[in-house]
Each structure stands twice: as structure tokens, then as C-alpha cells.
């Protein structure tokens, strides 16, 4: 018949402080471990992961319909025809940087509908 975890806890609860210290010493010796507190890890690991709030929209490839992509880029960026054409032809290129997630997703949708390959970073 084995002793359950609850029985062990009840047994330890009934011990005096000196008996618990002796029990800890005996367990350290028996199992070859130390009951010393573990060294804290780096503080950066404890910090919460910060949610990204600014995104970049990058034109990866033009696709088959270059004219539609140029029109979409002009509408989204406010660039002139020549500037938009140069930007599209220099793909991969950043179209907009530091915009909200909703704006980035909307821009990505418009450009993909025009036939472009787009990435939100």
C-alpha cells in the first residue's frame, strides 16, 4: 500500500518547524539536491510581449496586371503617375510604413484585388 500525496501533506503539516528543517536536510541528502532558491532569469524574459501597433505594407511583386496595380498604388499613396509607376517597377518596395493594422489590411486587400503580391510586416 503506497502513501498518497494528501497523506504526505497532512504528515508534514503536523511537524514542527525544527522537524521540517530536518526533513528538508534529509531530502537534500537523499536526492542530492539543494533547497536553495533558484537564480532569477533575465528580466527581459519576464516582460509581457508588446503588441505591434504599426505596420509596413510592402509590394512584393507586380503580378499580371501592372496598370491596375499602378492605379491602386496611386490611389493609396497619392503619388503622381510617374512616381507610382517607378515605385511599382522597383518591387519589392515599401508602399506605406508605420500605419495601423486596419489600414494595412485594407491597403493589402486593394492591391491584391489589382493583382499585386503584398506583404504586411
Curated annotation (Swiss-Prot):
One of its GO terms (cellular component) is cytosolic large ribosomal subunit. Keywords: Ribonucleoprotein, Ribosomal protein. InterPro entries: Ribosomal_bL12, Ribosomal_bL12_C, Ribosomal_bL12_C/ClpS-like, Ribosomal_bL12_oligo, Ribosomal_bL12_oligo_N_sf. One of its GO terms (molecular function) is structural constituent of ribosome. Homodimer. Part of the ribosomal stalk of the 50S ribosomal subunit. Forms a multimeric L10(L12)X complex, where L10 forms an elongated spine to which 2 to 4 L12 dimers bind in a sequential fashion. Binds GTP-bound translation factors. It comes from Erwinia tasmaniensis (strain DSM 17950 / CFBP 7177 / CIP 109463 / NCPPB 4357 / Et1/99). This is Large ribosomal subunit protein bL12. Pfam families: Ribosomal_L12, Ribosomal_L12_N. The keyword Ribonucleoprotein applies. Forms part of the ribosomal stalk which helps the ribosome interact with GTP-bound translation factors. Is thus essential for accurate translation. Belongs to the bacterial ribosomal protein bL12 family. It comes from the Bacteria. GO terms for biological process: translation.
Amino acid at each position: 500500500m503506497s502513501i498518497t500525496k494528501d497523506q504526505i501533506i497532512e504528515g508534514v503539516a503536523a511537524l514542527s518547524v525544527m522537524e521540517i528543517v530536518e526533513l528538508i536536510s534529509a531530502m537534500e541528502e537523499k536526492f542530492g539536491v539543494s533547497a536553495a532558491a533558484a537564480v532569477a532569469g533575465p528580466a527581459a524574459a519576464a516582460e509581457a510581449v508588446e503588441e505591434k501597433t504599426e505596420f509596413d505594407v510592402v509590394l512584393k511583386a507586380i503580378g499580371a496586371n501592372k496598370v491596375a496595380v499602378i492605379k491602386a498604388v496611386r490611389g493609396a499613396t497619392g503619388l503622381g503617375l510617374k512616381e507610382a509607376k517607378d515605385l511599382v517597377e522597383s518591387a519589392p518596395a515599401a508602399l506605406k510604413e508605420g500605419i495601423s493594422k486596419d489600414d494595412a489590411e485594407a491597403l493589402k486587400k486593394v492591391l491584391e484585388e489589382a493583382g499585386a503580391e503584398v506583404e504586411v510586416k
